Design a protein with these regions (language model features):
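Beta1/beta-strand and adjacent pyrophosphate-binding region of the FAD-binding site
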Residues: 40-50
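Glycine-rich N-terminal loop/short-helix segment of MobA-like nucleotidyltransferase
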Residues: 14
Length: 168
């Protein structure tokens, strides 16, 4: 048995996510926790609606971002983050925007300029499987300098199991 945790962040699979100014939430939190000199400036958009996304948004504010907004697929009533965590984030000035999913990240000279969201109509299908449905005609563009993707975590195995008989 090997338990290493899910230390990698997931990307959204949208155009522009490799631009300068885009990081995964866990990558950002790791840099904040390991190096207190991590700073942000300008406007930050956090994509995600779980507790980690709330932590990322609050850390972004503390790292110097002038304005922090969260956007998630879920409506407020099914948002996975703890209600008290969301309330505390809002008390700190973080805006929470429900039922929006990323469509693309707009760039200029390789840097984040804005993120385009599309309205999320539902997150799961009739069988309860993750299968977001969108209104591709209901779009919102949010200007920002930083995008922090906090939409899930992944395992980064690297060479950890190289030379072992452990099967995945």
């Amino acid at each position: 048995y090997v338990a290493i945790g899910a230390q990698g962040g997931r990307k959204a699979g949208v155009p522009g996510e490799d631009a300068d100014g885009v990081k995964t939430g866990v990558e950002f939190l790791r840099s904040v926790n390991l190096d207190e000199s991590t700073k942000l400036s300008g406007r930050t958009v956090v994509v995600g609606g779980g507790n980690v996304a709330v932590d990322v948004a609050r850390a972004a504010l503390r790292a110097g971002s002038g304005e922090v907004s969260m956007f998630c697929l879920e409506s407020r009533d099914i948002m996975p983050a703890a209600k008290d965590e969301v309330a505390e984030a809002e008390e700190e000035g973080i805006s929470v925007n429900n039922s929006w999913g990323p469509k693309e990240i707009l760039t200029e000279n390789g840097k984040v300029k804005a993120i385009v969201f599309k309205k999320c109509l539902s997150v799961k299908d009739a069988d309860g499987r993750f299968n977001p449905q969108y209104d591709e005609n209901d779009l919102m563009t949010v200007e920002c300098e930083n995008v922090l993707l906090s939409i899930g975590q992944s395992i980064v195995w690297g060479d950890l199991l190289k030379g072992t008989k452990v099967e995945i």
